[in-house]
């Protein structure tokens, strides 16, 4: 196994991530000693995982979604560390993280692309194209993973020729286009380091989504927030939440408004908001 990992790390250029599903044991157990090989040849590669190191954490399911709130910080340096007292504690921490955690271990959601109709297939099989997830399901995954401060990994299935099947490729293209259609052009946007930010629209118009992003180089400072819309001259709350981090996609009932206001109601330091934007998304 060590030779295989060395080949992978030396013959295929820079690797973004190497992921041992279920974990890579180490010489203290019965497993191969792979982490030093990755460290030597791919020092910038994300590693997942053994009992000493996990650069991110699994979000607790293979549905392509994570729970909410979802914090990037964690009480231990890796998600399967012996410091975590029980399996029950571990499962809860995998799903939500710990806002007071000292370590940066962000969540990862995963799902196979061919997971519809109860299939959940990680590897290619013939005549399986009807189990490619529909676009609506994939968008739901996106909003409940990336939109909840996690990353999203989709399992793709190369065919026996080493190629991605045309149906899979087409669905991925449609997915990218739909993400861009929904969130590529905001009605209005702003940023700032303050407790409150306001978006003023040119005229009254419907809004049903907002995106908030923190400058995560400063950590996750926001603990609670609310978004209000100005309706007939008065502010009314349209949604509220807790974790923001890299990205929070907030979906709420469409409201006709002239302005939106983000108020951070609880934080551990002055909020560093890198992006606050509003959208009117027509859902297909």
List each model region and its residues:
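Mature catalytic domains of secreted/periplasmic carbohydrate-active enzymes
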Residues: 1-232, 237-252, 263-280
């Amino acid at each position: 196994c060590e030779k295989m990992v060395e080949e992978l790390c030396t013959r295929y250029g820079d690797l973004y991530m190497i992921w041992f599903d279920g974990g890579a044991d180490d010489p203290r157990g019965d497993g191969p000693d792979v982490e030093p090989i990755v460290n030597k040849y791919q020092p910038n590669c994300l590693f997942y995982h053994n009992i000493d190191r996990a650069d991110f954490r699994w979000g607790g399911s293979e549905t392509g979604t994570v729970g909410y709130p979802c914090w990037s910080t964690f009480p231990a340096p890796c998600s399967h560390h012996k410091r975590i007292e029980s399996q029950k504690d571990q499962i809860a921490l995998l799903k939500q993280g710990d806002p007071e955690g000292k370590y940066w271990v962000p969540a990862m959601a995963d799902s196979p692309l061919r997971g519809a109709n109860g299939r959940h297939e990680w590897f290619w099989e013939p005549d399986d194209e009807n189990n490619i997830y529909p676009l609506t399901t994939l968008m739901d995954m996106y909003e409940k993973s990336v939109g909840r401060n996690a990353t999203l990994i989709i399992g793709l299935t190369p065919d026996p020729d080493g190629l991605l099947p045309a149906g899979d490729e087409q669905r991925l293209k449609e997915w990218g286009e739909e993400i861009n259609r929904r969130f590529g052009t905001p009605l209005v946007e702003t940023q700032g380091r303050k407790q409150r930010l306001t978006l003023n629209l040119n005229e009254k118009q419907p809004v049903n989504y907002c995106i908030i992003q923190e400058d995560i180089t400063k950590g996750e400072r926001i603990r609670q927030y609310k978004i209000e819309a100005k309706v007939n001259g008065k502010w009314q709350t349209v949604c509220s939440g807790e974790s923001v981090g890299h990205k929070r996609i907030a979906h709420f009932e469409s409201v006709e408004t002239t302005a939106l206001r983000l108020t951070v109601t609880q934080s551990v330091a002055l909020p560093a908001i890198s992006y606050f934007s509003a959208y009117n998304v027509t859902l297909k």
